[in-house]
């Protein structure tokens, strides 16, 4: 049996007969055999590759990496997702059979990371394209954090209800492309030259007069704490 706790698998008789439901039995079989589709585009994926070694041994969780989305039920996105890659990612997700799950690994996947401030081609979060079940922050996350994310996903699968999963399948048309990105053509601000007014400022803006300095210092020293 798995180490994941089940709400309905704790009723045993004196003859060691386990009373359960088909829903719990289905969840137990699925959480012990997750087949991930690895979608790594940056350095975060190297941390996930560390799980394959003997130190962490991710085979004990029943993970079998697949190269085809039609044979996978978990997609693990790691790294930056660009606008050009977005249609391919959504197509891979749509080709996965139900039920399917998503783990967003790393800051670049969750929020765009350091590329989200001045890059016009970076998707600000993979959840704008596909629904995410577990968020794994970090830059990059450690292998122990990846194992913790997999454990949380297994607990989520263990408590799923078939009716809720059927409702999500009926609303499949709303599960992807939740937010449309709008691109506007504007004048480029990266000209390759430095702003001279920022480098050579007048002394009046850089220097602080001694009178102002001692005035602020005396005001700080005269402040008293009141209990």
UniProtKB/Swiss-Prot annotation:
It is a peripheral membrane protein. It holds the Pfam family Oxidored_q6. The keyword Hydrolase does not apply. Its EC number is 7.1.1.-. It is an enzyme of class 7 (translocase). The gene is ndhK. Belongs to the complex I 20 kDa subunit family. Keywords: 4Fe-4S, Chloroplast, Iron, Iron-sulfur, Membrane, Metal-binding, NAD, NADP, Plastid, Plastoquinone, Quinone, Thylakoid, Translocase, Transport. GO terms for biological process: aerobic respiration; electron transport coupled proton transport; photosynthesis, light reaction. GO terms for cellular component: chloroplast thylakoid membrane; respiratory chain complex I. It comes from the Eukaryota. GO terms for molecular function: 4 iron, 4 sulfur cluster binding; iron ion binding; NADH dehydrogenase (ubiquinone) activity; quinone binding. NDH shuttles electrons from NAD(P)H:plastoquinone, via FMN and iron-sulfur (Fe-S) centers, to quinones in the photosynthetic chain and possibly in a chloroplast respiratory chain. The immediate electron acceptor for the enzyme in this species is believed to be plastoquinone. Couples the redox reaction to proton translocation, and thus conserves the redox energy in a proton gradient. This is NAD(P)H-quinone oxidoreductase subunit K, chloroplastic. It catalyses: a plastoquinone + NADH + (n+1) H(+)(in) = a plastoquinol + NAD(+) + n H(+)(out); a plastoquinone + NADPH + (n+1) H(+)(in) = a plastoquinol + NADP(+) + n H(+)(out). Its main location: plastid. Its cofactor is [4Fe-4S] cluster. Binds 1 [4Fe-4S] cluster. NDH is composed of at least 16 different subunits, 5 of which are encoded in the nucleus. It comes from Sorghum bicolor. [4Fe-4S] cluster binds at residues 43-44, 108, 139. It is found in: Plastid, Chloroplast thylakoid membrane.
